[in-house]
Amino acid sequence: MATLKDIRTRIKGVKSTQQVTKAMKMVAAAKLRRAQESAVQARPYAAKLKEMLGSLSTKVDTSLNPMLSARDEVGRVLVVLITSDRGLCGAFNTNIIKVAQKVMTVDHADLHKSGKVDLICAGSKGYDFFRKRDYRILKGYPGVFQNLDFSVAKEIAEQASGMYLRGEVDKVVVVYNEFKSVLAPNLKSEVLLPITPEGSGDEGGSDYIYEPSPASIIDVLVPKHLNTQVWRMMLESNAAEQAARMAAMDSATENAKELLRLLNISYNRARQAAITTELSEIVAGAEALQGT
């Protein structure tokens, strides 16, 4: 049975941990507000670019732009995985890593077995996980979320599009956490290349007049679209990470509160037992003296 000193030490340790988790929850909440604003602000711009591509694709021969044309056969796949740099965010990284593994080993099982699935990791957790295993990592970006910058998203998009244009890969998939709410992260795997513009059916393209020509505009718009989509996904992941950390720290704080309650009960019981034992010894000693 634990002594009073042991229980006091545990209570002190749990209180210290509770203070840390409570502070981390407050920090995550502040970061979440900023990250959520950035993610929400990026969505309309990304959506409008996609809408414009849908309109343009009805006015030009999409086969003239390789990034708008799906390959007849997919012989090699590039997976871009976005995770966090830090832990203490629940199952945030574990769940998205599982999705990435499924994309590589299940959705593209034959290509994976033949070593034709490449990987780019943005974030330390995904990079650290896959570099210790049998996966082909082309590039890692550990620490990218410590100072999140558009230039990294642009670099990833340019590398992916360059590989696609050179025929080094036939498909690019991005795996990331999309921010929905604090309690409902959305695990996503989106095809970045080839681009499938929304609204490219019979009704697309009637609302815009393009100058100088749709063909010249689409060549400029496609790279902007790719850069923006990768940036949006990184912003979404950052917001989802802060939400997951806030929820995890809130849960840890509540668990610490419950553990303190149980430890206090144990402490009081142990203290009561010690007092009872001392009283019994005193009474027994007094009775022994009276009997002599």
UniProtKB/Swiss-Prot annotation:
It holds the Pfam family ATP-synt. InterPro entries: ATP_synth_F1_ATPase_gsu, ATP_synth_F1_gsu, ATP_synth_F1_gsu_CS. GO terms for molecular function: ATP binding; proton-transporting ATP synthase activity, rotational mechanism. GO terms for biological process: proton motive force-driven plasma membrane ATP synthesis. The keyword Ion transport applies. PROSITE patterns: ATPASE_GAMMA. This is ATP synthase gamma chain. Keywords: ATP synthesis, Cell membrane, CF(1), Hydrogen ion transport, Ion transport, Membrane, Transport. Produces ATP from ADP in the presence of a proton gradient across the membrane. The gamma chain is believed to be important in regulating ATPase activity and the flow of protons through the CF(0) complex. Transmembrane segments: none annotated. GO terms for cellular component: plasma membrane; proton-transporting ATP synthase complex. It is a peripheral membrane protein. The keyword Transcription regulation does not apply. F-type ATPases have 2 components, CF(1) - the catalytic core - and CF(0) - the membrane proton channel. CF(1) has five subunits: alpha(3), beta(3), gamma(1), delta(1), epsilon(1). CF(0) has three main subunits: a, b and c. NCBIfam families: ATPsyn_F1gamma, PRK13425.1. It comes from Prosthecochloris aestuarii (strain DSM 271 / SK 413). Belongs to the ATPase gamma chain family. The lineage of its organism: Bacteria, Pseudomonadati, Chlorobiota, Chlorobiia, Chlorobiales. It is found in: Cell membrane.
